[in-house]
Amino acid sequence: MEYAPEFDNSYARQLSGFYTRLQPTPLKGARLLYHSKPLAQELGLDAHWFTEPKTAVWAGEALLPGMEPLAQVYSGHQFGMWAGQLGDGRGILLGEQRLNDGRYMDWHLKGAGLTPYSRMGDGRAVLRSVIREFLASEALHHLGIPTSRALTIVTSDHPIYREQTERGAMLLRVAESHIRFGHFEHFYYRQQPKQVQQLADYVIARHWPQWVGHQECYRLWFTDVVERTARLMAHWQTVGFAHGVMNTDNMSILGITMDYGPFGFLDDYVPGYICNHSDHQGRYAYDNQPAVALWNLHRLGHALSGLMSADQLQLALEAYEPALMVAYGEQMRAKLGFLERDSQDNDLLTGLLSLMIKEGRDYTRTFRLLSEVEVHSAQSPLRDDFIDRAAFDDWYRRYRSRLQQESIDDDQRQQSMKAANPKYILRNYLAQQAITQAEKDDIQPLQRLHQALQQPFTDQPEFDDLAALPPDWGKHLEISCSS
């Protein structure tokens, strides 16, 4: 007997006034282009769910029993300014799938048509942006970074007008929750404190049930949100990921990555890297992300000020920097091959990063090559990458000396370092190549890239071309917010 997912929509049942009910608006000539087999397996969906009769679900043409589609309302700060009411302008929450382990997963259809919150938009998504989000969310997941996931890509013959005419598409996004900082801001700025508390109680009962009824449940919950967000920033910084649009309406209350737009991974190590060509002031530059996340948490704290005292809010927010520094320190030590802490570790890290800045070295390649270092060999696989050999040799001498303090052998250390230093990341030019071919109905590059990204830390000789340094044109792609 075929497995039938069990759906609910607690958001619809428990949070009246927080959404608008509506049906998805199908695209003309919609067809399933691609899906994530690993995610499908996690959701209990076999191959039959991705054959022609079932395509209607992924294309917004049919609903499964228990689904109650709705668009959520929220507000937010965008580029540091209060933007007022926003909401799901082109996405519809179809329902929540109950998994065998008791968890619930939102099914959210992006590009599903106009909603009351579309503002000046058309409610649609283009194939280009759908493929980028699919690949990015799958890439971050396999890098071990908390993120929403992407299950299906639907393409169509429906023309969508952006800077040029593009194909309309839909993405089925999966996450434990789509609640954002901006949900709380919306009701706070509308002077609806009961709704703020109602939403907080819903989130705590759903995702932090251990604190229901606790005298300080709101402080404990907010502190965990702060710490989760801090750890997420540490993950982003260590892999060289820039989100690009860290508005409060794009910040998850669960501390996961969501709302992929003009994101980018570092090629050359440029701390001030700006991936969004609309970010003229560099607010969301790579090296500014941890500070912006804290600013956003302060905005969330302000929205929650009716639930906690000022001292409780401050105490929760003060957990951010220690959580960030601990997580970042642990992850960067792992990238350097250090199991134990040492007073010289930070100098060695900043020394290497300074060399990379000075010579424009590739972030991912440098750390991956570092994983091949042999402690007792004066020859480094990295040396030929640097022009200033004297400066590198001085750093490398100190680095080898530090490695000799570790209690594991080369093989063990190299394996642990490779598990912290990916070989394959989603470079913008690789995503663009996959998009270009998919727009011609050739999904082989998309499929191949997706396959490589599922094992980013493993040497896969058949995908060596996907680990190569980008061509010059590939380093300077400007990514638009239009999607």
Curated annotation (Swiss-Prot):
Lineage top rank: taxon: Bacteria
Annotated Mg(2+) binding sites: 250, 259
Record keyword Lyase present: no
Cofactor(s) listed: Mg(2+); Mn(2+)
Keywords: ATP-binding, Magnesium, Manganese, Metal-binding, Nucleotide-binding, Nucleotidyltransferase, Transferase
Catalyzed reactions per annotation: L-seryl-[protein] + ATP = 3-O-(5'-adenylyl)-L-seryl-[protein] + diphosphate; L-threonyl-[protein] + ATP = 3-O-(5'-adenylyl)-L-threonyl-[protein] + diphosphate; L-tyrosyl-[protein] + ATP = O-(5'-adenylyl)-L-tyrosyl-[protein] + diphosphate; L-histidyl-[protein] + UTP = N(tele)-(5'-uridylyl)-L-histidyl-[protein] + diphosphate
Keyword Metal-binding: yes
UniProt EC number: 2.7.7.-, 2.7.7.108
Recorded GO MF terms: AMPylase activity; ATP binding; magnesium ion binding
Enzyme class at the top of the EC tree: transferase
Coiled coil: none
Positions with a binding annotation for ATP: 87, 89-90, 110, 122-123, 173, 180, 259
Catalytic residues (UniProt): 249 (proton acceptor)
InterPro entries linked: SelO
HAMAP family xrefs: YdiU_SelO (MF_00692)
Record's function text: Nucleotidyltransferase involved in the post-translational modification of proteins. It can catalyze the addition of adenosine monophosphate (AMP) or uridine monophosphate (UMP) to a protein, resulting in modifications known as AMPylation and UMPylation.
Family in the record: Belongs to the SELO family.
Protein name stated in the entry: Protein nucleotidyltransferase YdiU
